[in-house]
């Protein structure tokens, strides 16, 4: 699995302020309600700084958040203190996460599952999800497609805000289907000086068919795929796909 966010977590929300969390949360809520899930426990897998977790808590769900980055969870805890939501955050690797019981739904947003670099490990994640879902529970998640990584290619992205600046150097290997991005960022300190940090992250491109096969192998029922957070089916130009799957038994062995 790729490296978890470290120092960049301090400004993650600042530089990712273009992500429409509220809109996506409304979409997720509607899909869950269509399946009869209007309340109860919901797991946000790869919750990051807790932005989506907070939105779903606002919608009335009892939220659990799992993430492998202590720095990202620190930001999530700060949001929790502000909102007053009773959210349980767990510092765990999604490949080995453990819960105290089952949940009505699991969600995973913002490419979190693309950080799983091997299909065998993604299968293990799916089996864990299936294991911790209530009977008939729902799994809704998104992932970035190979088309997205091809479009980004070897681009360099730069941005600057009051809190700091960052440079994002991207490299995509179409043979290995691995996308690597090197983050160089400068965070402003209390003294007014800037400190330099560097992080490297990797994600894997999966096709919708690969995802469907792994879900079924994990024991889940594949229901639908959507072009991003819309009602349209995915196509060859889709850069983000949303998947809806359902628990249908615990017959598959955990490995």
How would you label these PLM feature ranges?
Residues 140-212:
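SAM-dependent methyltransferase
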Residues 123-135:
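A short glycine-rich, Lys/Arg-flanked "PGG" loop and its adjoining helix->strand segment in the class I
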Residues 204-255:
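C-terminal lobe and adjacent flexible extensions of AdoMet/dcAdoMet transferase-like proteins
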Residues 43, 50-96:
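Class I SAM-dependent methyltransferase SAM/SAH-binding core
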Residues 98-105:
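A short acidic, Gly/Pro-enriched loop at the edge of an enzyme's catalytic core
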Residues 109-111:
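Residues lining the SAM
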């Amino acid at each position: 699995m790729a490296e978890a966010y470290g120092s960049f977590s301090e400004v993650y929300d600042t530089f990712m302020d273009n992500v429409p969390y509220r809109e996506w949360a409304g979409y997720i809520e509607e899909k869950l309600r269509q399946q009869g899930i209007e309340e109860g426990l919901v797991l946000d897998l790869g919750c990051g700084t807790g932005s989506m977790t907070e939105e779903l808590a606002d919608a009335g769900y009892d939220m659990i958040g799992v993430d492998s980055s202590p720095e990202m969870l620190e930001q999530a805890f700060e949001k929790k203190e502000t909102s007053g939501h009773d959210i349980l955050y767990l510092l765990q690797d999604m490949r080995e996460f453990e819960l105290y019981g089952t949940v009505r739904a699991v969600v995973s947003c913002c490419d979190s599952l693309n950080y799983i670099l091997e299909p065998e490990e993604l299968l293990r994640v799916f089996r864990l999800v299936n294991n911790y879902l209530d009977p008939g529970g729902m799994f809704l998640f998104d992932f970035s497609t190979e088309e997205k990584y091809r479009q980004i290619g070897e681009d360099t992205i730069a941005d600057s805000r009051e809190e700091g600046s960052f440079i994002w150097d991207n490299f995509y290997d179409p043979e290995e289907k691995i996308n690597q991005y090197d983050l160089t960022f400068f965070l402003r300190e209390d003294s007014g000086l800037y400190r330099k940090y560097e992080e490297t992250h990797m994600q894997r491109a999966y096709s919708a068919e690969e995802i469907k096969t792994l879900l079924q192998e994990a024991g889940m029922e594949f229901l639908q795929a959507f072009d991003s957070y819309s009602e349209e089916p995915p196509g060859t130009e889709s850069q983000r796909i949303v998947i809806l799957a359902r628990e249908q038994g615990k017959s598959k062995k955990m490995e």
